[in-house]
Design a protein with these regions (language model features):
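Bacterial N-terminal signal peptides
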Residues: 9-17
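Hydrophobic beta-strand positions
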Residues: 93-95, 108, 155
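Extracellular/periplasmic ligand-binding regions of membrane signal-transduction receptors
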Residues: 29-73, 108-115
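Short N-terminal helix-loop-first-beta-strand/juxtamembrane motif that initiates sensory/input modules
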Residues: 35-53, 80-101, 138-140
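C-terminal segment of classical bacterial N-terminal signal peptides
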Residues: 16-24
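Extracytoplasmic/periplasmic sensor domains and loops in membrane signaling proteins
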Residues: 74-88, 105-145
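Conserved beta-strands of PAS-like sensory domains
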Residues: 67-71, 147-173
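Bacterial N-terminal signal peptides that target proteins for export
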Residues: 1-8
Length: 173
């Protein structure tokens, strides 16, 4: 009887795990990143077109306020947390501020456990080189001293100008 009870519990646990995180079980790192990117972009698109309207303080820095439709993303973590809840990993919305891209909505954590808002996209990294050309970057990146498998895609306004960056990533094993 004990053996069958154990097997039932194991089966229930396995079924629950598969239902809650199928992408992480069956997909590899590249597929995970691509699926997460599609999710963050589709969630943003349901809010509306990306625009920059006004400025706002993010972690003490005054930066442009990026919106999807009427929803301001600066200091708003709903979208990135929903993505993390659904597919794991990390997600960020960056806004272009001068020559930098600043994290305004993120679930990437600093060493002290706080959200890494106000930090910038590595100015010497491969991702920013691609984004500066209006291109996407998929590959490894160092994020706040830790290796991640990542995806970065430009956020464009209605005129096609790059106004920000979508980011998703998974800590490299």
């Amino acid at each position: 009887m004990k053996k069958s009870k154990f097997l039932l519990v194991l089966l229930a646990f396995t079924a629950d795990f598969l239902v809650q995180s199928p992408a992480r079980v069956f997909a590899g790192p590249v597929e995970d990143v691509q699926a997460a990117m599609q999710l963050v972009k589709s969630k943003a698109a349901t809010l509306g077109a990306p625009i920059v309207n006004g400025d706002e303080a993010v972690a003490g820095k005054i930066v442009p306020a990026i919106h999807f439709g009427a929803t301001k993303m600066n200091n708003n973590f709903v979208l990135v947390d929903e993505v993390q809840k659904e597919v794991g990993g990390t997600a960020t919305i960056f806004v272009k501020s001068g020559d930098e891209f600043v994290r305004v909505a993120t679930n990437v954590k600093k060493d002290d456990g706080s959200r890494a808002i106000g930090t910038i996209l590595d100015p010497k990294g491969k991702a920013i080189a691609a984004i500066a050309k209006g291109e996407s970057y998929y590959g490894e990146a160092d994020i706040l001293g830790k290796p991640y498998v990542t995806g970065y895609e430009p956020v464009r306004d209605a005129s096609g100008n790059v106004i920000g960056v979508y980011y998703v990533g998974y800590l490299k094993n």
